[in-house]
Amino acid sequence: MHVNDNLQQMAYDTFMHSFFRKESNGKLGDIIVENAKSPIQVGDAKAANNGDIPFFTSGDAVLKWPEALVTGRNCYLNTGGNADVKFYVGDAAYSTDTWCITASGEMSDYLYLLLLSIKPELNQKYFQGTGLKHLQKPMLKDRPIYIPATKELDTFNKTVQPWFDMIASNVKESQSLVALRDWLLPMLMNGQAVVED
């Protein structure tokens, strides 16, 4: 979805323009708020794959789940394999191998873009292990970061949050259209519905 990609790129560019190379004044752990660990295995979600709640995994696929574990503005990080960071606004669920976090003080969008900006560093420095690499959460929480002042954050959020809200709205609308297509297409194919001029 090109519109969503463009909105995300605009948000990222705004973050980089506003905060890149700012001197550290805190640690990542100062702003992170951890959501509860999910009891849901990816296999269970793949088998069910029903409902209308997005289900985030440590892979690229976003599955479906019948009930939300969280709501609001949340980041979803892989805990094994390779670093990846996803962001979603609204009700969502996630697998046991996904670390779901948000941020204190209206900093969730900032947190997501910060993590996205250090994604190569996440992969190289904070994923360790001999076989399957795992995210080293304590090390990541100890990473120095710039924590914006309230006025800076307000200005940033007024610009960026509507873009992420629009992305979430576009995703939900696309899902509704896919559901309508999946319901209507079989009816058209077997003659239960016809299209008239």
Where are these regions (language model features)?
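Non-catalytic DNA-recognition/assembly elements of restriction-modification systems
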Residues: 1-59, 150-196
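DNA target-recognition domains and sequence-specific DNA-contacting regions of bacterial/archaeal
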Residues: 26-148
